[in-house]
Amino acid sequence: MSDNAQLTGLSDRFRGFYPVVIDVETAGFNAKTDALLEIAAVTLKMDADGWLTPDETLHFHVEPFEGAILQPEALAFNGIDPHNPLRGAVSEYDALHAIFKMVRKGMKESNCNRAIMVAHNATFDHSFMMAAAERASLKRNPFHPFVTFDTAALSGLALGQTVLAKACIAAGMPFDSTQAHSALYDTEQTALLFCEIVNRWKRLGGWPVPPLAAEDATPQDGE
Protein backbone atom coordinates (compact mmCIF):
# COMPACT_ATOMS: atom_id res chain seq x y z
CA MET A 1 0.00 0.00 0.00
CA SER A 2 1.32 3.45 -0.87
CA ASP A 3 1.93 6.13 1.75
CA ASN A 4 -0.90 8.17 0.23
CA ALA A 5 -3.32 5.25 0.50
CA GLN A 6 -2.31 4.75 4.12
CA LEU A 7 -3.18 8.37 4.83
CA THR A 8 -6.51 8.35 3.01
CA GLY A 9 -7.92 4.89 3.71
CA LEU A 10 -11.01 4.68 5.88
CA SER A 11 -9.53 1.91 8.02
CA ASP A 12 -6.39 3.95 8.71
CA ARG A 13 -8.34 7.11 9.51
CA PHE A 14 -10.31 5.45 12.33
CA ARG A 15 -7.89 2.72 13.48
CA GLY A 16 -9.74 -0.08 11.78
CA PHE A 17 -13.19 1.15 12.76
CA TYR A 18 -15.90 1.46 10.11
CA PRO A 19 -18.14 4.43 11.02
CA VAL A 20 -21.87 3.96 10.43
CA VAL A 21 -24.33 6.74 11.17
CA ILE A 22 -27.47 5.59 12.98
CA ASP A 23 -30.63 7.30 14.19
CA VAL A 24 -33.63 5.71 15.89
CA GLU A 25 -37.11 6.88 16.75
CA THR A 26 -38.67 5.16 19.74
CA ALA A 27 -41.73 4.97 21.97
CA GLY A 28 -39.84 5.99 25.10
CA PHE A 29 -36.44 6.20 26.75
CA ASN A 30 -36.02 2.66 28.11
CA ALA A 31 -34.30 0.45 25.52
CA LYS A 32 -35.34 -2.74 27.31
CA THR A 33 -39.07 -2.00 27.61
CA ASP A 34 -40.01 0.72 25.08
CA ALA A 35 -40.53 0.06 21.38
CA LEU A 36 -38.06 0.78 18.61
CA LEU A 37 -40.24 2.33 15.89
CA GLU A 38 -37.87 3.54 13.18
CA ILE A 39 -34.19 3.16 12.32
CA ALA A 40 -31.95 4.48 9.57
CA ALA A 41 -28.31 3.82 8.76
CA VAL A 42 -25.85 5.65 6.51
CA THR A 43 -22.43 4.20 5.72
CA LEU A 44 -19.47 6.42 4.85
CA LYS A 45 -16.62 6.31 2.35
CA MET A 46 -13.36 8.16 1.71
CA ASP A 47 -12.24 9.32 -1.70
CA ALA A 48 -8.69 9.06 -3.01
CA ASP A 49 -7.77 12.35 -1.36
CA GLY A 50 -9.05 11.36 2.06
CA TRP A 51 -12.32 13.31 2.13
CA LEU A 52 -15.21 11.64 3.93
CA THR A 53 -18.68 11.47 2.32
CA PRO A 54 -21.94 9.54 2.85
CA ASP A 55 -22.26 6.29 0.95
CA GLU A 56 -25.21 3.88 1.25
CA THR A 57 -28.48 4.37 3.15
CA LEU A 58 -31.07 2.01 4.64
CA HIS A 59 -34.27 3.04 6.41
CA PHE A 60 -36.99 1.01 8.10
CA HIS A 61 -40.17 1.54 10.05
CA VAL A 62 -40.16 -1.10 12.76
CA GLU A 63 -42.96 -3.11 14.36
CA PRO A 64 -43.10 -2.80 18.17
CA PHE A 65 -41.84 -6.01 19.74
CA GLU A 66 -44.32 -8.15 21.66
CA GLY A 67 -45.06 -6.58 25.03
CA ALA A 68 -43.35 -3.29 24.15
CA ILE A 69 -44.43 -0.17 26.01
CA LEU A 70 -45.66 2.76 23.92
CA GLN A 71 -45.22 5.95 25.90
CA PRO A 72 -47.87 8.51 24.79
CA GLU A 73 -45.50 11.43 25.35
CA ALA A 74 -42.90 9.91 23.04
CA LEU A 75 -45.44 9.22 20.31
CA ALA A 76 -46.76 12.77 20.56
CA PHE A 77 -43.19 14.07 20.24
CA ASN A 78 -42.17 12.10 17.15
CA GLY A 79 -45.64 11.94 15.56
CA ILE A 80 -45.45 8.21 14.86
CA ASP A 81 -48.58 6.05 14.87
CA PRO A 82 -47.19 2.55 15.48
CA HIS A 83 -50.45 0.93 14.35
CA ASN A 84 -50.72 2.73 11.00
CA PRO A 85 -50.57 0.01 8.31
CA LEU A 86 -49.23 2.53 5.80
CA ARG A 87 -45.94 2.61 7.72
CA GLY A 88 -44.92 -0.65 6.06
CA ALA A 89 -43.17 -1.66 9.26
CA VAL A 90 -40.91 -4.71 9.45
CA SER A 91 -39.71 -6.76 12.39
CA GLU A 92 -36.66 -5.78 14.43
CA TYR A 93 -34.94 -8.86 13.03
CA ASP A 94 -35.56 -7.91 9.39
CA ALA A 95 -34.49 -4.29 9.88
CA LEU A 96 -31.28 -5.04 11.74
CA HIS A 97 -30.40 -8.07 9.64
CA ALA A 98 -30.46 -5.87 6.51
CA ILE A 99 -28.48 -3.08 8.17
CA PHE A 100 -25.87 -5.46 9.58
CA LYS A 101 -25.49 -7.11 6.16
CA MET A 102 -24.87 -3.72 4.52
CA VAL A 103 -22.38 -2.82 7.26
CA ARG A 104 -20.43 -6.07 7.02
CA LYS A 105 -20.16 -5.62 3.24
CA GLY A 106 -18.80 -2.10 3.72
CA MET A 107 -16.36 -3.27 6.38
CA LYS A 108 -14.95 -5.89 4.04
CA GLU A 109 -14.61 -3.45 1.14
CA SER A 110 -12.91 -0.87 3.39
CA ASN A 111 -10.61 -3.37 5.12
CA CYS A 112 -12.08 -2.50 8.52
CA ASN A 113 -12.46 -4.96 11.38
CA ARG A 114 -15.27 -3.48 13.50
CA ALA A 115 -18.15 -1.07 12.91
CA ILE A 116 -18.58 1.92 15.19
CA MET A 117 -21.84 3.80 15.60
CA VAL A 118 -21.91 7.50 14.80
CA ALA A 119 -24.98 9.16 16.31
CA HIS A 120 -26.18 12.37 17.91
CA ASN A 121 -26.32 11.64 21.65
CA ALA A 122 -25.07 8.21 20.70
CA THR A 123 -25.69 6.43 24.01
CA PHE A 124 -29.44 6.55 23.34
CA ASP A 125 -29.32 5.16 19.80
CA HIS A 126 -26.69 2.58 20.70
CA SER A 127 -28.71 1.24 23.63
CA PHE A 128 -31.87 0.80 21.52
CA MET A 129 -30.07 -0.85 18.61
CA MET A 130 -28.18 -3.24 20.87
CA ALA A 131 -31.33 -4.15 22.82
CA ALA A 132 -33.20 -4.84 19.58
CA ALA A 133 -30.34 -6.96 18.25
CA GLU A 134 -30.40 -9.00 21.45
CA ARG A 135 -34.18 -9.50 21.26
CA ALA A 136 -33.83 -10.57 17.63
CA SER A 137 -31.06 -13.04 18.55
CA LEU A 138 -28.77 -11.60 15.89
CA LYS A 139 -25.41 -13.20 16.57
CA ARG A 140 -23.26 -11.44 13.98
CA ASN A 141 -23.53 -7.89 15.27
CA PRO A 142 -20.71 -5.94 13.59
CA PHE A 143 -20.92 -2.95 15.95
CA HIS A 144 -18.55 -2.36 18.86
CA PRO A 145 -20.43 -3.15 22.08
CA PHE A 146 -19.73 0.20 23.72
CA VAL A 147 -17.47 2.53 21.68
CA THR A 148 -19.27 5.26 19.69
CA PHE A 149 -18.60 8.55 17.93
CA ASP A 150 -21.05 11.08 19.40
CA THR A 151 -21.69 14.03 17.10
CA ALA A 152 -23.21 16.01 19.97
CA ALA A 153 -19.83 15.96 21.72
CA LEU A 154 -17.88 16.50 18.50
CA SER A 155 -20.14 19.43 17.55
CA GLY A 156 -19.67 20.99 20.97
CA LEU A 157 -15.93 20.88 20.43
CA ALA A 158 -15.80 21.90 16.77
CA LEU A 159 -18.81 24.20 16.46
CA GLY A 160 -19.84 25.30 19.95
CA GLN A 161 -23.27 23.70 19.53
CA THR A 162 -24.71 20.40 20.78
CA VAL A 163 -28.28 20.46 19.39
CA LEU A 164 -28.35 18.77 15.97
CA ALA A 165 -30.22 21.54 14.16
CA LYS A 166 -28.01 24.29 15.61
CA ALA A 167 -24.84 22.31 14.93
CA CYS A 168 -25.83 21.82 11.28
CA ILE A 169 -26.53 25.52 10.86
CA ALA A 170 -23.24 26.42 12.58
CA ALA A 171 -21.47 24.10 10.13
CA GLY A 172 -23.04 25.96 7.19
CA MET A 173 -25.54 23.22 6.42
CA PRO A 174 -29.29 23.66 5.90
CA PHE A 175 -31.63 22.02 8.40
CA ASP A 176 -35.36 21.60 7.79
CA SER A 177 -37.04 21.54 11.20
CA THR A 178 -40.25 20.19 9.63
CA GLN A 179 -38.40 16.95 8.82
CA ALA A 180 -36.70 16.64 12.21
CA HIS A 181 -37.40 13.49 14.25
CA SER A 182 -37.66 11.43 11.11
CA ALA A 183 -34.97 8.78 11.51
CA LEU A 184 -34.06 9.03 7.83
CA TYR A 185 -33.67 12.81 7.76
CA ASP A 186 -31.84 12.98 11.08
CA THR A 187 -29.45 10.22 10.01
CA GLU A 188 -28.69 11.91 6.70
CA GLN A 189 -28.04 15.23 8.44
CA THR A 190 -25.93 13.61 11.14
CA ALA A 191 -23.87 11.88 8.45
CA LEU A 192 -23.24 15.18 6.67
CA LEU A 193 -22.39 16.85 9.97
CA PHE A 194 -19.90 14.14 10.95
CA CYS A 195 -18.28 14.30 7.51
CA GLU A 196 -18.00 18.08 7.76
CA ILE A 197 -16.33 17.90 11.18
CA VAL A 198 -13.86 15.22 10.06
CA ASN A 199 -13.10 17.04 6.79
CA ARG A 200 -12.81 20.42 8.53
CA TRP A 201 -10.23 18.96 10.91
CA LYS A 202 -8.28 17.75 7.86
CA ARG A 203 -8.54 21.15 6.15
CA LEU A 204 -7.22 22.81 9.30
CA GLY A 205 -4.17 20.56 9.26
CA GLY A 206 -5.18 18.25 12.08
CA TRP A 207 -4.96 15.14 9.90
CA PRO A 208 -2.82 13.23 9.17
CA VAL A 209 -0.94 13.09 12.46
CA PRO A 210 2.63 11.83 12.93
CA PRO A 211 2.77 8.04 13.34
CA LEU A 212 2.98 6.63 16.85
CA ALA A 213 6.51 5.91 18.02
CA ALA A 214 5.74 2.31 18.95
CA GLU A 215 2.63 0.89 17.35
CA ASP A 216 3.05 -2.39 19.18
CA ALA A 217 2.35 -0.49 22.41
CA THR A 218 -1.06 0.71 21.20
CA PRO A 219 -3.80 -0.39 23.65
CA GLN A 220 -6.35 -2.84 22.33
CA ASP A 221 -10.09 -2.11 22.03
CA GLY A 222 -11.65 -1.45 25.41
CA GLU A 223 -8.38 -0.71 27.20
Swiss-Prot record:
InterPro entries: Exonuclease_RNaseT/DNA_pol3 (IPR013520), RNase_T (IPR005987), RNaseH-like_sf (IPR012337), RNaseH_sf (IPR036397)
GO biological process: DNA replication proofreading; tRNA processing
Residues of the site described as Important for substrate binding and specificity: F29, F77, F124, F146
Record bears the keyword Metal-binding: yes
Required cofactor(s): Mg(2+)
Class of this enzyme: hydrolase
Cysteine disulfide partners in this protein: none
Protein name listed in UniProt: Ribonuclease T
Natural source organism: Cronobacter sakazakii (strain ATCC BAA-894) (Enterobacter sakazakii)
